[in-house]
Amino acid sequence: MPQELVYTLQQLADLLKVEVQGNTETPISGVEEISEAQSHHVTFLDNEKYSRFIKNTEAGAIILSKAQAQKYGHLNKNFLIVSEFPSIAFQKCIELFIPPIDSGFPGIHPTAVIHPTAHIGKDVFLEPYAVICQHAQIGDSSHIGAGSVIGAFSTLGEHCYVHPKVVIRERVVIGKRVIVQPGAIIGACGFGYITNAFGRHKHLKHLGQVIIEDDVEIGANTTIDRGRFKNSVIREGTKIDNQVQIAHHVEVGKHSMIVAQAGIAGSTKIGNHVIIGGQTGITGHISITDHVIMMAQTGVTKSISSPGIYGGAPARPYQEIHRQVAKIRGLPKLEERLGMLEEKVKGLSAQSEEAQITP
């Protein structure tokens, strides 16, 4: 394990380029969440629902926004003050105190299999049993994990990190600084079949590619299929969680986020800055505009043309769901009122019948 690092509060503030308030000589040697932090930890407050911990936390320093520092300044604690987004400064602290642990296999391992026509850039790491197929290209300072396969004619840009047991099929194009977690499969053939007169299914050859642009992250056991004729594309900066299925000829826009176990059917186009909640299912051949948020387990059956928050199955605006839920919650009282009305109607009917019989 790496040696423990210790910074004074002032040194930490200088590294983060933030203001400091309190004892500048306080030693800081680690990071922790606000409810568990001890005197040697730096922590942060981003979500105000955790503000109940700030009074009693034993943290050596707390990262706050300027507005929060004014609000909690009377507590006489050590603060690191940022203009906004304390969580970003805290992430930098994590990177300072907890450096990444590499596999211990520097350079190109002797068991790695490299085709003679493949091109390997400078300072590339190839872990044990990595396979680089014909005419594949690996950019400078990229890292290919143990047992991963880079298919024929595929290209990876600079500073990519492909974790162990990843399969990147043939003719896949991956940009710079892309991270692919273990078990992901990129470029498999899409789920496309034709059924003949005898009811037998024949798989259709998929000729398209998968294009992954710069700064994309792909989670563990996620699958991105190639298109039948056109390419499947993941645009710049998009982050994809674990166990996500992206079908053939899907296009996902820039800086979107797709949460675990979501599935996007073929030929669907997702806009920029879209958030797709966990276990959401999106049908094929539709489009989702920019700045749409889909709650968990949303079922999207048709195109969405207006930004906003959507949920339910079929998907509908969040406000509409709230109104429907409120009405559903009122059903027991409505049933009770209907029962009372039925009894009154029965009573009135009986009185009417008696009045008709009485001479």
Swiss-Prot record:
Q: Transcription regulation: is it a keyword of this entry?
A: no
* Reaction(s) the record says it catalyses: a UDP-3-O-[(3R)-3-hydroxyacyl]-alpha-D-glucosamine + a (3R)-hydroxyacyl-[ACP] = a UDP-2-N,3-O-bis[(3R)-3-hydroxyacyl]-alpha-D-glucosamine + holo-[ACP] + H(+)
UniProt GO molecular function: N-acyltransferase activity
For this UniProt record, the keywords arranged alphabetically read as follows: Acyltransferase, Lipid A biosynthesis, Lipid biosynthesis, Lipid metabolism, Repeat, Transferase
- Give Gene Ontology CC terms: membrane
Report the EC code(s) recorded for this entry: 2.3.1.191
For biological process, the GO terms are: lipid A biosynthetic process
Pfam families to which the protein is assigned, alphabetical: Hexapep, LpxD
Catalytic residues of the enzyme: H248 (proton acceptor)
Q: In which pathway does it act?
A: Bacterial outer membrane biogenesis; LPS lipid A biosynthesis
Q: How does it assemble?
A: Homotrimer.
Fetch the PANTHER family from UniProt: UDP-3-O-ACYLGLUCOSAMINE N-ACYLTRANSFERASE, UDP-3-O-ACYLGLUCOSAMINE N-ACYLTRANSFERASE 1, MITOCHONDRIAL-RELATED
Q: Which family does it belong to?
A: Belongs to the transferase hexapeptide repeat family. LpxD subfamily.
| Name the UniProt record assigns to this protein | UDP-3-O-acylglucosamine N-acyltransferase
Task: Name the source organism.
Answer: Chlamydia felis (strain Fe/C-56) (Chlamydophila felis)
Primary gene name = lpxD
